[in-house]
C-alpha cells in the first residue's frame, strides 16, 4: 500500500508541474480553449508517463491540434519537469487526448 500512495503522490506532483509548465508556454493554440491535464500515469521506474489531457477547443483550434502541439513540446516539458522536481531521470511524456469529459457531455445531452 505505501508504494501505491507514493506513486499516487508522484503522479499528482508531475501533473501539477506539467500544468504550470504548459501555463507558461507562449503558443496561442494552448491558451485558445480550456485545456485541462486530467491525470498522469507514470511507470513505477519513472521511465515514461502517460499524460491525459482534455480540451474544450475555441474556434479554429481542434483538440487534436492541441495534443499535437503538446507532443512536439514534450522534450521541453520533460526537461523543465526534471529541473523543477529535482529528479534524476524525468519520464518520457506521452500526451493522450482524454475524451471522458466529451463523452460525459454527450450523455448529459442525451438525458436532457
Task: Label every model-predicted segment.
Residues 1-48, 54-112:
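Charge-rich, low-complexity N-terminal segments
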Amino acid at each position: 500500500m505505501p508504494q501505491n500512495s507514493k506513486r499516487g503522490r508522484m503522479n499528482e506532483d508531475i501533473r501539477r508541474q506539467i500544468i504550470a509548465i504548459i501555463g507558461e508556454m507562449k503558443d496561442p493554440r494552448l491558451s485558445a480553449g480550456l485545456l485541462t491535464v486530467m491525470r498522469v500515469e507514470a511507470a513505477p521506474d519513472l521511465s515514461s508517463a502517460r499524460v491525459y489531457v482534455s480540451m474544450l477547443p475555441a474556434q479554429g483550434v481542434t483538440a487534436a491540434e492541441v495534443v499535437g502541439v503538446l507532443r512536439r513540446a514534450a522534450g521541453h516539458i520533460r526537461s523543465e519537469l526534471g529541473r523543477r522536481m529535482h529528479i534524476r531521470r524525468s519520464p518520457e511524456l506521452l500526451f493522450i487526448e482524454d475524451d471522458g469529459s466529451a463523452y460525459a457531455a454527450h450523455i448529459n445531452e442525451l438525458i436532457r
